[in-house]
């Protein structure tokens, strides 16, 4: 695959998921959009690593670290969303103002 095709795919994925993150009203959907943004970035890391220096795996290794951090972020995010749902009975972002009780 050519470099331009993968970069266009990654930019397409990043831009539409960023739009989904901005317009999302549900916390779970926003968390999923954030994870997909990280996947678009990982696609760029692997593509540039393969295109410019295919003998070294720096982009792939960095991508694995980003995936591990994203997994931890998803676990913590889902725990926070679960706690907010138990207390507020809603996962809507505009109804989860924790400063006023």
UniProtKB/Swiss-Prot annotation:
Membrane topology: Multi-pass membrane protein
Catalyses which reaction(s): a plastoquinone + NADH + (n+1) H(+)(in) = a plastoquinol + NAD(+) + n H(+)(out); a plastoquinone + NADPH + (n+1) H(+)(in) = a plastoquinol + NADP(+) + n H(+)(out)
Pfam family, one: Oxidored_q2
Keywords on record: Chloroplast, Membrane, NAD, NADP, Plastid, Plastoquinone, Quinone, Thylakoid, Translocase, Transmembrane, Transmembrane helix, Transport
One Gene Ontology molecular-function label: quinone binding
One GO process term, biological-process aspect: photosynthesis, light reaction
Keyword Transmembrane: yes
Residue ranges crossing the lipid bilayer per the database entry: 2-22, 32-52, 61-81
GO CC terms in record: chloroplast thylakoid membrane; NADH dehydrogenase complex
InterPro entries given in the database record: NADH_UbQ_OxRdtase_chain4L/K, NUOK/Mnh_C1-like
Location(s) in or outside the cell: Plastid, Chloroplast thylakoid membrane
EC numbers: 7.1.1.-
PANTHER family in the cross-refs: NADH-UBIQUINONE OXIDOREDUCTASE CHAIN 4L, NADH-UBIQUINONE OXIDOREDUCTASE SUBUNIT ND4L
Role played: NDH shuttles electrons from NAD(P)H:plastoquinone, via FMN and iron-sulfur (Fe-S) centers, to quinones in the photosynthetic chain and possibly in a chloroplast respiratory chain. The immediate electron acceptor for the enzyme in this species is believed to be plastoquinone. Couples the redox reaction to proton translocation, and thus conserves the redox energy in a proton gradient.
Family of this protein: Belongs to the complex I subunit 4L family.
Subunit annotation: NDH is composed of at least 16 different subunits, 5 of which are encoded in the nucleus.
Name of the featured protein: NAD(P)H-quinone oxidoreductase subunit 4L, chloroplastic
Organism whose genome encodes this protein: Guizotia abyssinica
Gene designation per UniProt: ndhE
């Amino acid at each position: 695959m050519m470099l331009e095709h993968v970069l266009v795919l990654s930019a397409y994925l990043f831009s539409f998921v960023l739009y989904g993150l901005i317009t999302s009203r549900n916390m779970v959907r926003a968390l999923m959009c954030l994870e997909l943004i990280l996947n678009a970035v990982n696609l760029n890391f692997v593509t540039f690593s393969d295109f410019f220096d295919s003998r070294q795996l720096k982009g792939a290794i960095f991508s694995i670290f980003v995936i591990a951090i994203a997994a931890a972020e998803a676990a913590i995010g889902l725990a926070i969303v679960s706690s907010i749902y138990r207390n507020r009975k809603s996962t809507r972002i505009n109804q989860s103002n924790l400063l006023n009780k």
